[in-house]
């Protein structure tokens, strides 16, 4: 089964992201707006038990973190993804690194760039046009995230929560 690890931002930020995703992201119906902490990975039922155990420990050892969105940006020319850029805080980087160690060991496909996708799989012209419009807008959003989520992918391609982990162990 395929799994992933994400942070879900507040409803306010999700609503803003969805206002663009409805039109510019073909994955809109498959997963809510999120910040990917670890790329999707395959695991068996036995392996996922070890993963969950490790994630519980990671959550206990971590603290709630600040998510600060500062601008719209893009991964162009590598690919035509438009996103809300999150400041790469030490807490975010540390959480992502921990999610690539132990039972989750592996190498990320790309270096960690914290972001919330608002558009993808656009033609080059549409990408350029939409990004140009978004860059003219001010975006400044800050919130505290106190949990992360292990998701799994259903047969129809959509993602759902397998388990939620409170940062700081909920203490």
Swiss-Prot record:
The active site is at residues 34, 115. A motif (HXTX 2) lies at residues 115-118. One of its GO terms (molecular function) is hydrolase activity, acting on ester bonds. Its EC number is 3.1.-.-. Pfam families: 2_5_RNA_ligase2 (PF13563). Keywords: Hydrolase. Belongs to the 2H phosphoesterase superfamily. YjcG family. This is Putative phosphoesterase RBAM_011910. It comes from Bacillus velezensis (strain DSM 23117 / BGSC 10A6 / LMG 26770 / FZB42).
């Amino acid at each position: 089964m395929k799994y992933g690890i994400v942070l879900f931002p507040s409803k306010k930020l999700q609503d803003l992201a969805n206002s663009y995703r409805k039109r510019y992201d073909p994955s809109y119906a498959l997963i809510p707006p999120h910040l990917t902490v670890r790329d999707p990975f395959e695991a068996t039922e036995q392996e996922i038990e070890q993963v969950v155990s490790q994630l519980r420990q990671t959550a206990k050892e971590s603290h709630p973190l600040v998510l600060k969105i500062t601008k719209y940006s893009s991964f162009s020319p590598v690919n035509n993804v438009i996103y809300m850029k999150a400041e790469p805080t030490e807490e975010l980087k540390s959480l992502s690194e921990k999610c690539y160690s132990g039972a989750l060991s592996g190498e990320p496909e790309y270096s960690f760039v914290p972001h919330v996708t608002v558009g993808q799989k656009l033609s080059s012209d549409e990408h350029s046009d939409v990004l140009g419009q978004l860059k003219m807008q001010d975006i400044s959003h800050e919130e505290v995230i106190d949990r992360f989520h292990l998701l799994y992918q259903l047969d129809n391609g959509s993602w759902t929560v397998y388990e939620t982990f409170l940062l700081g162990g909920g203490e």
